[in-house]
Amino acid sequence: MQPRIKEVLTYLDGQYEALQKTFESIPIEKRSKSPAPGAWSPAGVIEHLASVETSIGRLISTRVAAGRESGLAPETDHSSVMETYTVGPLIGDRTRKIVSGERSHPVQQLAPDAAWNAFAAAHATLRSAVVDADGLAIGEIVHPHPVFGPLNLYHWVAFVGGHEARHAEQIREAAAAV
């Protein structure tokens, strides 16, 4: 596996595992409870992540397929992706409110297990799309993020990991408040 893909997948896998431990540490009876009117329950946060990762997985698959068709070069760069990922501190800052698009807001009617299963499936599909891009110079493919601006596909994968970490903290906060 190309070192840059391996690096972002290692980060992504670590954040996924941490999120799973956080969610599983919440008592079952608290997973569907919102901490305040209009706030997302832990299961609602997971439902949001399922929606977002479905969209980003589709984005990566589509952009990589288009890159292949247009002759995207093989990856020759072995430098660290994470050292150039400047969005990480911004997304990790829970004091900075970031409002997601309405499309990715949870309906909050899924049972916690159903929400987790939807998220796990979306995450697996996204991860598979990243593995499928192994060996290609996906740092050359740039797509705008609605809040953080242009990100290359490596940075999109790092964003997903940071997004999971941000929401793991939100889940801890929500569970503590109910």
What function would you assign to each model-found segment?
Residues 1-5, 23, 57-75, 100-117:
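Charged, low-complexity, helix/coiled-coil-prone segments
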Residues 5, 12, 42, 115-119, ...:
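Hydrophobic packing residues in well-ordered alpha-helices of helical domains and bundles
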Residues 32-90, 124-178:
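Short, contiguous alpha-helical
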Residues 15, 22, 80-137:
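Acidic/histidine-rich alpha-helical segments that form the ligand environment
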Residues 1-17:
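Extreme N-terminal tail/first-helix region
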Residues 24-31:
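Short, flexible helix-adjacent loops and helix caps
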